[in-house]
Each structure stands twice: as C-alpha cells, then as structure tokens.
A protein has these predicted regions:
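Conserved N-terminal/central alpha/beta ligand/cofactor-binding core
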Residues: 32-174
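N-terminal Rossmann-like FAD-binding beta1-loop-alpha1 element of flavoenzymes
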Residues: 4-29
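Phosphate-coordination loops involved in phosphoryl transfer and adenosine-cofactor binding
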Residues: 2-4, 154
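A short, basic/flexible loop-to-alpha-helix module at the beginning of a structural domain
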Residues: 1-2, 113
Length: 175
C-alpha cells in the first residue's frame, strides 16, 4: 500500500486531519478495529465554544484555566477556544445535527446551548447525549466521500517503510 500520508487512528483528530490533508495529498487512515470503535463515538456531553451573545473568549479562557487548576498551557487554551466556533461551524457543515433552540449566532444558526460544570456561560453545543457519535458519523461520511482518502478498518500497523531512504518503523500488528 502506498500513500502520501498515513494517519493511524480514525477518531475525530485522525479524520479531521485526513479531511484537511486530502485537499492536497492522498491520505490513508488506519483503524485498529471498526472506524467508530475509538473514544470519539463515546463522548456524550457536547463541545464548548463562545457562541452566545454576552459570552467572551476571555471568559471561556478563564473558566478553562480555573478548571485546569492552572496546569493548562495558556497559549494552547487560547488557540483552541478562539478557533472553536469555526470548528463547530465546520462540523455542522459536514452534517453534525446539533440540537436547535437558541438565539441566532454569527453563523446564522440557532443551536441549543447548555451550561456544564466549570463554565460561567451556556456554551455547550450538543446532539442530545450522543454528540461524539454524531461527530464520528459525520466525519466518517465525509472521509468516505473524499476520493483522496482511503479508510482501512481492522488494521494495526507493524512495519512501515517511509521516505526515499526506506527508513523503517515498527509498531504492533501488521500491514
């Protein structure tokens, strides 16, 4: 099997990376089991983002720093929080059916927002209590529909040969 980019893992991170990279490269995604067997599909609550009038990035950042007892990397927290609204909009465009029922946001959507522990504002978008499953299904569908992405379930990498110099890397399983 030859590919420009090999991604090991078919959860939200792996599939999101595959969709982004497939704009310019041939991408193969390996999953050690079924594509939806990872942790993403089990996430229940929702995704936090500043989407409500009156909420601010600064407030969300402070809530996150307090919840992390100051152990979080502030630059990382700021980056994630400032990009969360656009990430949620991308997920919605991929077909994640976030619950509706809130005020119209900057994307013209009326997502229902909840408030969960550690948050000072309503900022959790959700799909009932199965947000992870909905996100996983939307990402899988988009990846399946992309001609530059090959999805390989039930495959654990063991010997990978990469680059012009035939460097060899080993992990458990087999390709």
């Amino acid at each position: 099997m030859e590919t420009d980019i090999l991604i090991i893992g078919s959860g939200a991170a792996g599939l999101t990376a595959a969709l982004q990279l497939a704009q310019k490269h041939k991408v193969t995604v390996l999953a050690k089991g079924a594509l939806s067997d990872g942790a993403t599909a089990w996430a229940q609550g929702g995704i936090a983002a500043v989407l409500e009038p009156g909420d601010t990035f600064e407030s969300h950042i402070e809530d996150t720093m307090v919840a992390g007892a100051g152990l979080n990397n502030r630059q990382t927290v700021e980056f994630v929080i400032e990009h969360a609204p656009q990430a949620i909009d991308r997920l919605a465009k991929l077909g994640v059916p976030f619950n509706l029922g809130g005020p119209t946001n900057e994307f013209g959507e009326q997502w229902h927002l909840t408030r969960e522990g550690g948050h000072s504002h309503r900022r959790i978008v959700h799909v009932n209590d199965a947000t992870g499953w909905a996100v996983q299904q939307a990402l899988e569908s988009a990846a399946r529909d992309n001609p530059n992405i090959t999805l390989v379930p039930d495959m654990v990498a063991i010997d990978l040969i990469v680059g012009r110099h035939q460097e060899r890397f080993s992990t458990s399983g087999r390709v």
